[in-house]
Amino acid sequence: FLDRAHRIDSVVRPSQLCNLYSLSGGSKDDPEQVVEFFASFDPESLPQKVRGAWIDEICSVRDELSYCLQRLAQAGYAQYWQEQVRPCLNNAIEQYRIAPEQLGAIHQEITRLAGGQPLDATGSRIYILGNIDNAFALLDETFCCTPLLLDPETARQYRIDFMQVYIHENLHRLSLSGELLDMLQTLYDNDDFYRTHEDRARAYGEGGNEAFVVAAERYVSRRLGRIDDKQVLDEVLVYCAGTLVLAPIVYRYLPDLRNGESFDGFLRRLFDRRIRPGKVESQYRRAMKKLAGTRKSEPTAAETRARTHTPYRHAAARHPHPLRSRPGR
């Protein structure tokens, strides 16, 4: 069992399996349905928009999945879930409190960034924390939210902020155009400074459009008074060891967002005028100088150790997200 589980873990992530099964519409409370689905699902029957390498990876370990799922079902995992896990999860959710006006303000800011464009209907609603360094979002609102993410003491100890997660994940509901993604690829192909840092970010399972979301989350949180300027700087410095070099540039210019302009439109305008091949390093230095004043723009060793991995890493390779040019974590 462990050998097969290790093989599965080396190829796919739990979120991929959860998201695939949620697309089936099958019951998550019926072990037989789960076992049957992963043993027999036809990749060609899936909607074209969700197909990709992540589906092929799941198919490559189908035999191992079938074996492990059958053994879990035979061992009574469904009963364990209902009697031990679900009550704990439900209690954590019921005990969590947030003021309705705070949620309303967050939603208003996200809507403003949408600039009249519709938000992705499959936006993140519920959040899973597999371990302290890997929080990720799932598509299906009927999945659980673990006590770790909501527990105040754990949040203080590991610098986990559920509302930051909430804002960050819901910003992934903003759509970006193919034109902007092409601009991002052109930048990667033609700017050495950006490409070097982007390759490092990808080694963390991030990169791509993640810098846009990091910048937007800090912008929204700062506008709402949830954080101060130092916290903006800290996030830029330590998120994936400071490799998302577009984040401070985007953050610097977000106050120039025009009335009614979408986030996509703003970013395309920014790429046209500021974020151009050969100019990223100078723009990054200017943005960091504005954020940091005289403080150096490289993270200290202590800062890097504190949060080399962001506490709200995303589920990798779920079906293509409108705000990702490639699967991210």
Describe each PLM feature range:
Residues F1-G25, R195-G260:
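Metalloprotease/metallohydrolase-associated module, dominated by Zn2+-dependent proteases
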Residues F1-Q79, R305-R313, R318-R329:
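N-terminal low-structure segments adjacent to metalloprotease catalytic domains
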Residues Q84-D140:
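Auxiliary, metal-adjacent structural segments of Zn-dependent hydrolase domains
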Residues L89-P100, E153, D161, E198-Y204:
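Second-shell loop/turn segments in exported
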Residues L148-Y166:
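Short pre-active-site segment immediately N-terminal to the catalytic Zn-binding motif
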Residues I160-L181:
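Active-site recognition of the HExxH zinc-binding catalytic motif
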Residues L176-G205:
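Post-HEXXH active-site segment of zinc metalloproteases
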Residues E217, G225-R307, P311-H314, R318, ...:
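Pan-zinc metallopeptidase signature
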